[in-house]
Amino acid sequence: RNMEKKQAVVTSDTLTKEQIRELAAKSLAGIKNSYAPYSHFHVSAVLLCGNGAVYTGNNIENAAYTPSVCAERCAFFKAVSEEERDFAAIALCGGLKGVVKDYCAPCGVCRQVMREFCKPDFKIILVKSEEEWKIYTLSQLLPEGFGPENLE
């Protein structure tokens, strides 16, 4: 379990440049933990909870492909299994053979998982380096998303 508890409360609206830089650095450092022997495309994600807790995740591939999991879902599932339900942001990076050369966006399945647990203004930070990132909201990357309220 890779979790750090902090006292400060953070939301998507109060996220600071320093916090973003910290998430970017952790994402870049965590890429070495990816298990991608088939695609050789390594991905790392760092999820920031509203209470300041941080959960990491990596893509974990499987020879049968279907059981593989993306880094973003890995981080979310770790957090949710630890009773977290309030999320502020996620930073992610990825690259062939673990070398980050460009921005890496979440796949559609990961966007849908984020939609299950996050507000439309949830921040998704695509990391290229500690100083180069792009920030999107969930509603920008998944407009008109289907969520729990659609089933009420």
Q: Where in the sequence are the language-model features?
A:
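Zn2+-dependent cytidine deaminase-like catalytic core
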Residues: 56-150
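Short, compositionally biased leader-like segments
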Residues: 3-25, 129
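Short glycine/proline-enriched turns and hinge-like loops at secondary-structure junctions
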Residues: 38-40, 69
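Small-residue (primarily alanine) positions within well-ordered alpha-helices
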Residues: 27, 45-46, 75, 79
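Short beta-strand scaffold segments in enzyme catalytic cores
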Residues: 40-49, 125
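Short, basic/aromatic recognition patches
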Residues: 21-36
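N-terminal charge/polar-biased segments
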Residues: 2-5, 150-152
